[in-house]
C-alpha cells in the first residue's frame, strides 16, 4: 500500500484510512490488528471494522490532539501490547484519515515511550518514516511536517508534564509522585482485566524478555511486574 509506511520494522504500519480493497491488501500482507483514530462523524469514510477480526477505535478530532492525557497513555500502552504480542509475519495498521497529523502524533508519542528517546528525536523519526511513502514523492509532504504546530507541541510537552515518564530525563519532574505512579497502574490493571485478550498479551510478553526476543519498554516491564505482584498478593491474602 503506497499510502503507508512502517514505524516498527516489519511489524507496525501507519497511514491513511483504507478502502475495502486496501483492507484486503493489508490483511494479505499480514495485518491482524487495525487501530482507527477517526471519529464517527467524519464524512466520506467507508466503515470497514466489520470486515476485520481485530479493530480498535481511539477517536481524535481531525487536526486536534487527545483531550485526556491519562486515557491517551493507556491507549499508547495498548498499542505497545499489541505490537509486542505480534507473531511471526503478523502486523498492525494504525491510521487516521489522511495518514498525516493524528497518526503522526500517536506514533511520535509511541516511539518516545517505547524507545526511551526524546520527543524531538521521535518527531524527527516520524517525519522520516512519513516521507518515505511512495505516494508522497515529489509532493509537499515529502518535505513538510505531517503534524501541525499544535500537534507537535502536544508531543513535545506530553512526557515533560505527565506523571509517568519514559527513560529520558523529562523537562519537568515536579509533577511526578510515587503515589501517582501506583495509582496509574491500579487503573491500568483494572482496564486490562476488562480486556482479557490484551491482559493475556501483556503477561505472555514476559516470555519474550526471558528468551531475549526483543526489548520491552520500561513502562511495560513495570506494568507486568505490578500485575503479577497484585495477583500474587491476592493469593497470599486468601491463604493467610
From Swiss-Prot:
Family matches, as InterPro entries: Prot-tyrosine_phosphatase-like, PTP-SAK, Tyr_Pase_AS, Tyr_Pase_dom, TYR_PHOSPHATASE_DUAL_dom
Entries under PROSITE patterns matching the protein: TYR_PHOSPHATASE_1, TYR_PHOSPHATASE_2, TYR_PHOSPHATASE_DUAL
GO MF entries: protein tyrosine phosphatase activity
Enzyme type, top EC level: hydrolase
Active site as annotated: 96 (phosphocysteine intermediate)
Bridged cysteine pairs (disulfide): none
Entry's EC annotation: 3.1.3.48
Keyword entries, A-Z: Hydrolase, Protein phosphatase
Domain Tyrosine-protein phosphatase: 3-151
Substrates-to-products reaction catalysed: O-phospho-L-tyrosyl-[protein] + H2O = L-tyrosyl-[protein] + phosphate
Any Pfam family the entry gives: PTP-SAK
N-terminal signal peptide: none
Family to which the UniProt record says this protein belongs: Belongs to the protein-tyrosine phosphatase family.
This protein's name: Putative tyrosine phosphatase 067L
Organism, scientific name: Invertebrate iridescent virus 3
